[in-house]
């Protein structure tokens, strides 16, 4: 099934979830086990971290991490599909127990939610066709730059646009829409991760895409509700063992075809 159709179907799931009333969030590991399921927010429009397979089932790096978390708790995982802007609201409205969705750890987000220790990381970069000369923020002046709304690169490039008048920012609600805009020529450049299908495609003029310059390296944590220390501490312990046992490294090679970066701790 074409990826765009898969993404549209995922959007229907998101719409349905958005209409559901807030449920009673489990505050402890014991409560999750007693309830009999772990509820996790994921984004299925961000390959290789989250996407839909041929059977329309969520798969990817983040999906496997979330699945293994449920296995460690001895309960199945119920996935709630969100896009980047919906990650924090899914915790604030108590629809999910955790967010496993390339959720970069930032001080601004940590005001609203709590994070686990990092389990993965990637560089945010500016991407454009090879024929487009870009080496820094100043080269984006006069160009349309696409972003996924609510991502870490959104903040960086929005600040760059404020400091460099003439950069036009276009925001998209999911990675698939951003990707389509880049391929079709609706935008001149995009902010995104150093991964993904964009490098397998051609621009509207037949060019290959390439990374132009690095914005910053971000590290992903599992998000939980503020002050849910019982669950957060359990997740930290579990992630420690997952990394020590080589599971995270194996998942990185499976889905990203590259080893994990060195992960800081806090």
Predicted regions and their residues:
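Ligand-binding cleft/hinge of the Venus flytrap
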Residues: 52-54, 66-75, 153-171, 201-205, ...
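Periplasmic-binding protein-like
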Residues: 120-128, 198-240, 258-266
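Ligand-binding clefts/hinges and TM-proximal coupling segments of bilobed small-molecule sensing domains
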Residues: 28, 152-169, 208-211, 240-266
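Extracytoplasmic small-molecule ligand-binding "clamshell" domains
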Residues: 26-102, 254
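Extended ligand-binding regions for polar small-molecule ligands
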Residues: 63-72, 131, 138, 143-144, ...
């Amino acid at each position: 099934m074409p990826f765009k159709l898969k993404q549209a179907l995922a959007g229907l799931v998101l719409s349905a979830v958005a209409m559901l009333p807030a449920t009673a969030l489990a505050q402890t590991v014991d409560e999750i086990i007693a309830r009999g399921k772990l509820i996790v927010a994921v984004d299925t429009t961000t390959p290789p971290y989250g996407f839909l397979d041929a059977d329309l089932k969520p798969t990817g790096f983040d999906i496997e991490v979330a699945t293994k978390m449920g296995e460690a708790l001895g309960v199945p995982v119920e996935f709630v599909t969100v896009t980047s802007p919906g990650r924090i609201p899914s915790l604030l409205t108590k629809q999910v127990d955790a967010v496993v969705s390339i959720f970069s750890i930032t001080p601004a987000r940590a005001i609203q939610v709590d994070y686990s220790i990092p389990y993965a990381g990637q560089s945010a970069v500016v991407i454009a066709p090879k024929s487009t000369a870009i080496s820094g923020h100043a080269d984006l002046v006069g160009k349309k730059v696409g972003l996924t709304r609510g991502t870490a690169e959104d903040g960086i490039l929005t600040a760059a646009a404020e400091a460099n008048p003439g950069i036009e920012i276009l925001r998209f609600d999911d990675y698939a829409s951003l990707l389509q805009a880049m391929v079709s020529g609706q935008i001149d450049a995009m902010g995104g991760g150093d991964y993904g299908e964009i490098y397998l495609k051609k621009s509207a003029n037949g060019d290959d895409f390439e990374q132009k310059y690095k914005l910053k390296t971000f590290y992903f944590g599992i998000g939980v509700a503020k002050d849910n220390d019982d669950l957060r501490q359990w997740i930290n312990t579990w992630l420690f063992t997952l990394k020590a046992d080589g599971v995270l490294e194996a998942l990185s090679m499976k889905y990203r075809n590259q080893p994990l970066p060195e992960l800081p701790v806090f």
